[in-house]
């Protein structure tokens, strides 16, 4: 059975395969990864709310980076880039 491709799988795979402890992407790169046919939504270019690390809004891109184990730490709307940091997993919680 073929695995279903989800909307944000491209960004999840890209960040997992190319990110270290931190990765910076331009809005153009995000366009190409997430929205190759339509581009980022206008709200992503106008407000930092679109970039919130929040699973409760599936229409936004958070699924992509959170599922990859990263969070947005910087959004620069003027220069059109985003910085993601790898989420730290604390082993002491499970000892």
Per-region residue spans from a language model:
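Ser/Thr/Pro-rich, acidic low-complexity intrinsically disordered regulatory segments
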Residues: 1-23, 37-95
């Amino acid at each position: 059975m073929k695995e279903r491709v989800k909307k944000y799988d491209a960004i999840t795979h890209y960040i997992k395969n190319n990110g270290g402890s931190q990765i910076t992407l331009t809005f153009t790169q995000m366009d190409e990864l997430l929205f190759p046919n339509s581009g980022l939504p206008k709200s992503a270019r106008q407000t930092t709310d679109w970039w919130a690390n929040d699973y409760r809004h599936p229409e936004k891109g958070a699924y992509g980076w959170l599922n990859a184990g990263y969070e947005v730490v910087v959004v620069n709307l003027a220069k059109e880039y985003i910085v993601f940091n790898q989420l730290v997993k604390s082993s002491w919680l499970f000892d």
